[in-house]
């Protein structure tokens, strides 16, 4: 399984990280196979305020996340 880290930050546009999060999360489910990706969010602080004032809690802080194979920066 590959680790996919999505870096989030204050004023991030919600669709810019939730779209890729969803795609990597459901990849492989239709075929009934094992999930090929472990997807998680990473930030400099635990709580992030998105552009529309939505409060998001990051899965990991920088330096504490599993070693990523893929890093996405919206």
Model region roles, listed by residue range:
Residues 1-74:
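Extended, subdomain-level signal for the structured scaffold at the beginning of enzyme domains
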């Amino acid at each position: 399984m590959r680790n996919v880290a999505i870096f989030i930050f204050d004023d991030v546009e919600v669709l810019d990280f939730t779209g890729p999060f969803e795609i990597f999360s459901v990849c492989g489910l239709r075929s009934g196979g094992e999930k090929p990706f472990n997807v998680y969010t990473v930030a400099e602080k635990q709580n992030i305020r998105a552009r529309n004032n939505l409060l998001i809690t990051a899965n990991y802080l920088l330096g504490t996340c599993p070693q990523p194979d893929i890093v996405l920066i919206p």
